[in-house]
């Protein structure tokens, strides 16, 4: 399988190219169906992309529904500790008309919230998934493509590993792993792959090795590896990603 790989020499070009492609895909959906559903992950490298996307012209945001890949239980989605906080700061604050009914409510009854979210996403066609994997190849809180929760339709409760939880010990977020919640809600790989279009964004020195996991000859259990099955996958590489020639 030949991968659609886009290399960018600057962060500015990285952010601009991805936001323009995302905006174009949203516009196409709005023209063809009158609505658009967008799935977003919450890695830091999406912040600049979301800022530019929020200012894109020609998008009626009142007809756009947002879904989030994962979030922790017991955390308000508007809190700085929430995985959805970047969506609030970078996208929703600028476009309050966006439908937020499908965002994760980590303060709700967990089993009821999973049922609610799964019903909503299974009723929709996800037009665009804008994703940025974690350093281990995880997608949100989902870290194994072969786990039971990765094969269901919709969302599930999950217990992220210590390695996943450590990745959220960051300035302005959690000060130590002991503060990071031990349970969350995450979307299955099966549901992610139902998206019409997937933009996979890689940036940061620690993520260079992830490109190899997208190579067709590499077997991996990391969820990022499942994305290579998708016929409309586009991989965007930031300037700090070292490229393996075999993956070109």
Q: What are the roles of these predicted feature ranges?
A:
Residues 39-43, 68, 104, 129-134, ...:
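Short beta-strand segments
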Residues 44-45, 133-138, 144, 205, ...:
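Short glycine-rich anion-binding loops that position phosphate/pyrophosphate groups of nucleotides
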Residues 187-190, 194-248:
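ATP/nucleoside-binding phosphotransfer catalytic cores, i.e., glycine-rich phosphate-binding loops
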Residues 27-55:
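Glycine-rich N-terminal segment of FAD-binding domains in flavoprotein oxidoreductases
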Residues 136-187:
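Class I SAM-dependent methyltransferase SAM-binding "motif I" and its flanking Rossmann-like core
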Residues 2, 61-132:
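Ligand-binding beta-strand-loop-alpha-helix segment within the catalytic cores
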Residues 1-38:
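N-terminal glycine-/serine-/threonine-rich phosphate-binding loop
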Residues 52-61, 85-89, 144-155, 216:
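A glycine- and small-aliphatic-rich helix-loop capping segment at beta-alpha/alpha-beta transitions
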